[in-house]
Amino acid sequence: MEPRKNVTDFVLLGFTQNPKEQKVLFVMFLLFYILTMVGNLLIVVTVTVSETLGSPMYFFLAGLSFIDIIYSSSISPRLISGLFFGNNSISFQSCMAQLFIEHIFGGSEVFLLLVMAYDCYVAICKPLHYLVIMRQWVCVVLLVVSWVGGFLHSVFQLSIIYGLPFCGPNVIDHFFCDMYPLLKLVCTDTHAIGLLVVANGGLACTIVFLLLLISYGVILHSLKNLSQKGRQKALSTCSSHMTVVVFFFVPCIFMYARPARTFPIDKSVSVFYTVITPMLNPLIYTLRNSEMTSAMKKLWRRDLISSST
């Protein structure tokens, strides 16, 4: 389907046009992106190499880190480049590609967090059947399903926006291509289209978030049946999951579970779930996880020994 448009490229307005402020933001976002890449790559490598991190929880955690790597890379490099070089133009096709990648991995993360909550539920509420229920092929299927869910969500978003007429202006008041800022530039009535976007994005996020809250409520209720040591370990694991869920879902729900319009605060909220959350996820999951930190230390020592011999 060929897009009906006159606009061939867009201009991303970004955060500021002040050169001094752009330099400060460049350093800040570059640091955030480096920390995101290092932290998430470290988790992927550690889980892949370590023999002690073979449980489904770490398999899904590595999958989450991989998603965060691609998700962050679909947005941050162009943002950093624009702040450094001052080139904020993006072609129509590149804008659509960014939109597709960002939503396929963002959608996949939504479903994967639901899968991780189910894994946590089985581990705490059905510990004797955990290894039977969460067999390797089941984990692979659940991971694939989360990716398929993200793919379908992204295809639907792209199919909504791709064929719409963009007659001008071409200035996007944002730092990346997203649905609501793009709909603002469409030269036709977008009320019905906005409702579809809300249903596919905001409503889906809200339903999954409510399911997650219910599942964690059941898990917390089940903690009273565990020993004090088991309760502390389970509470540590679940609190990490819940922190990540809140950090990711609350901004997403604010952005997409509302009428298709833009607000000045949107850029700041978008930074939180596109830049900050992918950077914080490795810290949240590793700082309170003794098994993960121990495996990372062993991997670090092994690298030091091999490099010195």
UniProtKB/Swiss-Prot annotation:
Compartments where located: Cell membrane
GO molecular function, one term: olfactory receptor activity
Membrane is among the record's keywords: yes
Pfam families: 7tm_4
SS bond partners: 95-187
PANTHER family, A to Z: OLFACTORY RECEPTOR
Function: Odorant receptor.
Protein name: Olfactory receptor 4A47
Biological classification of the source: Eukaryota, Metazoa, Chordata, Craniata, Vertebrata
